[in-house]
């Protein structure tokens, strides 16, 4: 069996949440800086897109931030971010799709564009006190391990203008399964936070640096295609992909960054980029277009928060309510999820690959699920209800 298309990783960045407003937000095409039309990524196969090479000099500030991620004594000035900030601003409206320099066999992709949120709202999505799994369906679970979230928020959100402020935390994450391979992974990472003013514009950045290779892949599957982002998680190692169930894969390398640059009229230029290597026995089977596919899905999800009329204060309250539910209430809600899973596993009318879900369904996995993962499921569903897209909590 060829390895090339076995794995397309389910998630790239914990805070990878942005987009190219032209090529990704539904326009048929846009005139690029080079005078050619870039077709919408929503209407063609992404592997056929025209990729432009991101200049190494523009990415140099990211190497510096990664190198000094945990060395807060190192003085990094706002001016040192200028090459990357200038690149993002100058390409925010071009609609171009970017590939990153390949290093040691690791490929990467980047999207640059403009989104509609106030800069204050953008801060919310960069907050280490907001569990990422409550916002992005590409994550099963996310936890800040260093217990410094509130301190980091106070430091970042009260930072004086003109001064580059940095901090970091240690995080643990479990990504959602990929719908092709059925693989999901767990890993620890260093999350970095950066805020400052560059050429008179407020800038906020986050980065994710994987500490070591991920856990071995475990099997997962979409429960029903009517409910994107709703998965069943097996504890069995391997892939759900038929014929490759025995294959135990890993994420070997992962690094990502996002940047928000304040523009005007409640708009900001945004770039999100990731390098990722994943595969079997050190063989990287991911390519640029695989990575960009995942960026696109995260981008589409962010649209439900930006310019949709969703009250972000209500979102915060909704998440806090779920995080503070009693254990008994969480258990009562979790039973609804279990009933939903069992019902779907016994149905012959699923609008999804029935074999994939039925093949891995095991009631014992539901019974043995740790409490913190049960709570995460409940919080995710409460957010869906707020967005008017409930799944397992409704009767069918």
State the predicted function of each range:
Residues 1-8:
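Bacterial N-terminal signal peptides that target proteins for export
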Residues 8-16:
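Bacterial N-terminal signal peptides
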Residues 17-23:
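Sec/Tat signal peptide C-region and signal peptidase I cleavage site
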Residues 24-396:
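Terminal "cap-and-tail" regions of soluble proteins that handle hydrophobic small molecules
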């Amino acid at each position: 069996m060829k390895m090339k298309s076995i794995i397309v990783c389910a998630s790239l960045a914990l805070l990878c949440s942005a987009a190219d407003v032209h090529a990704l937000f539904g326009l048929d095409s846009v005139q690029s800086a080079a005078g050619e039309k870039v077709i919408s990524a929503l209407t063609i196969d992404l592997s056929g897109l025209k990729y432009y090479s991101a200049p190494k000099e523009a990415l140099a500030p990211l190497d510096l931030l990664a190198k000094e991620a945990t060395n807060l004594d190192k003085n990094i000035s706002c001016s040192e971010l200028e090459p990357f900030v200038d690149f993002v601003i100058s390409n925010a409206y071009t609609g171009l799709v970017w590939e990153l320099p390949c290093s040691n066999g690791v490929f990467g992709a980047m999207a640059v564009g403009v989104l509609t949120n106030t800069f204050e709202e953008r801060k919310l999505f960069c907050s280490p006190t907001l569990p990422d799994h409550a916002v992005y369906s590409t994550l099963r679970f996310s936890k800040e391990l260093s217990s410094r979230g509130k301190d980091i928020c106070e430091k970042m959100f009260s930072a004086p203008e003109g001064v580059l402020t940095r901090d970091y935390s240690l995080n643990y994450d479990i990504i959602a399964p990929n719908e092709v391979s059925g693989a999901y992974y767990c890993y620890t990472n260093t999350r970095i936070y950066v805020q400052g003013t560059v050429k008179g514009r407020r800038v906020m950045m986050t980065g994710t640096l994987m500490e070591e290779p991920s856990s071995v892949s475990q099997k997962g599957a979409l429960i029903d295609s009517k409910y994107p982002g709703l998965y069943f998680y097996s504890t069995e190692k391997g892939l759900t992909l038929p014929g490759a169930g025995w294959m135990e894969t890993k994420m070997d390398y992962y690094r990502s960054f996002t940047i928000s640059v304040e523009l005007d009229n409640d708009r900001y230029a945004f770039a999100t980029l990731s390098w990722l290597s994943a595969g079997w026995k050190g063989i990287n089977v991911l390519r640029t277009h695989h990575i960009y596919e995942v960026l696109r899905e995260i981008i589409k999800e962010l649209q439900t928060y930006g310019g949709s009329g969703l009250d972000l204060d209500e979102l915060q309250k909704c998440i806090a309510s779920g995080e503070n539910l009693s254990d008994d209430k969480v258990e009562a809600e979790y039973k609804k999820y279990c009933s939903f899973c069992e019902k779907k596993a016994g149905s012959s009318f699923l609008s999804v690959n029935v074999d994939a879900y039925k093949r891995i369904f095991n009631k014992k996995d539901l019974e043995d699920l740790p409490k913190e993962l049960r709570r995460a499921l409940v919080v995710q569903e409460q957010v869906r209800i707020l967005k008017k897209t409930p799944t397992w909590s409704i009767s069918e």
